[in-house]
Amino acid sequence: MLKIIIPTAMLMPMTCLSKPNMIWINSTTYSLLISLISLSYLNQLGGHSLNFSLLFFSDSLSAPLLVLTTWLLPLMLMASQSHLSKETPSRKKLYITMLTLLQLLLIMTFTATELIMFYILFEATLIPTLIIITRWGDQTERLNAGLYFLFYTLVGSLPLLVALLYIQNTTGTLNFLIIQYWAKPISTTWSNIFLWLACMMAFMVKMPLYGLHLWLPKAHVEAPIAGSMVLAAVLLKLGGYGMMRITVLLNPATNQMAYPFMMLSLWGMVMTSSICLRQTDLKSLIAYSSVSHMALVIVAVLIQTPWSYMGATALMIAHGLTSSMLFCLANSNYERVHSRTMILARGLQTILPLMAAWWLLASLANLALPPTINLIGELFVVMASFSWSNMTIILMGTNIIITALYSLYMLIMTQRGKYTHHIKNINPSFTRENALMALHLLPLLLLSLNPKIVLGPIY
């Protein structure tokens, strides 16, 4: 485990000691090397977990998320270069240090064995994210967005700490590896219902569940590009990962308690997709589409069948790469047009044909076209929910149609139509941006050749 944690920690002093003209080159190449080392975790034998020590372990659920986390740091650094070109070197170094610190905390969160340690790290990821949003965001509303983000997540996860201390007292351990054998079945008495809610609410807010999702569009819209990328790609996955880990302790209460939340998710999935059709702000549209995709993951985790778990894991990885790519594309538009409003940036296909190709591929990945891993995840979730209840197919089908509609709407609004006069003399697409898009899309396509490495612990 230390072969990733120590190099990531040493990224911080390396950034601080780099010469001003070498900051980006050093940090990007070094973080790419770290992400290549982390690939060794994917090749695990059967369903066994790699127990690195008493503190860290990795199994087939956390390994794909771990690799996604490390893979995202070089991409975030590549995406942030022109956004930070006006800043002083010390500010750039601080920014990279924040991203590295965030990656370090996320790696430790995904591999922690103790639930209390998981909780502390889960909360600690708020701090660098908050600093990134409130310091480098574009508009003045970023402070408001940061407050929303902080308080939603904190208030949601405080009861979790109380619940964890209670479980520690009753079972005597909070170690993931031991507690699955020691956990006593939880019946549906009133006290256990509150215990269930306390355990799940933190992750429901983080996912986010429809109704608790108001912080997400705000935080996404106001964050700088790297903030949006890491928020969409990894921080939302913390919720899904935590839910999968903690449902082991909460059976059989989950079977009764899951119904209202599944209804809310299925309804919210259709609602947020419909909200996407009415958006004028590009980043806001992508943020709402994230909510609708993560609602599928909530449904899958609460169904608790092997298929739904596999679908949830695959969908989390796929959504991480897809939404991150869409945010990068939105950012490349923003850097040229200096507005997130879609009407002001229409007709870009005639000026930037290669970017239009990336837009098309990203939109197709977002609506789960066959060769991508998105399809595998969505197919598993839809089939699992259909076998749970036949009625869900109505909502799932509606959601899939609306997803196709808003993806088409996004593509037509930004790429087609008559271009406006103020974008005649914009910059061409850089090699850096094309490489960034390719590095997002390649894993999505290559994983479909061998999807079992992202299908989680049950496969």
Swiss-Prot record:
The chain crosses the membrane at residues 22-42, 60-80, 92-112, 113-133, 147-167, 193-213, 224-244, 257-277, 284-303, 308-330, 351-371, 393-413, 435-455. It is a multi-pass membrane protein. It catalyses: a ubiquinone + NADH + 5 H(+)(in) = a ubiquinol + NAD(+) + 4 H(+)(out). GO terms for cellular component: mitochondrial inner membrane; respiratory chain complex I. It is found in: Mitochondrion inner membrane. Its main location: mitochondrion. It comes from the Eukaryota. It is an enzyme of class 7 (translocase). Its EC number is 7.1.1.2. Coiled coil: none annotated. Keywords: Electron transport, Membrane, Mitochondrion, Mitochondrion inner membrane, NAD, Respiratory chain, Translocase, Transmembrane, Transmembrane helix, Transport, Ubiquinone. One of its GO terms (biological process) is mitochondrial respiratory chain complex I assembly. GO terms for molecular function: NADH dehydrogenase (ubiquinone) activity; ubiquinone binding. It holds the Pfam family Proton_antipo_M. InterPro entries: NADH4_N (IPR000260), NADH_Q_OxRdtase_chainM/4 (IPR010227), NADH_UbQ_OxRdtase (IPR003918), ND/Mrp_TM (IPR001750). Core subunit of respiratory chain NADH dehydrogenase (Complex I) which is composed of 45 different subunits. Core subunit of the mitochondrial membrane respiratory chain NADH dehydrogenase (Complex I) which catalyzes electron transfer from NADH through the respiratory chain, using ubiquinone as an electron acceptor. Essential for the catalytic activity and assembly of complex I. PANTHER family: NADH-UBIQUINONE OXIDOREDUCTASE CHAIN 4. Belongs to the complex I subunit 4 family. This is NADH-ubiquinone oxidoreductase chain 4. It comes from Felis catus (Cat). The lineage of its organism: Eukaryota, Metazoa, Chordata, Craniata, Vertebrata. The gene is MT-ND4.
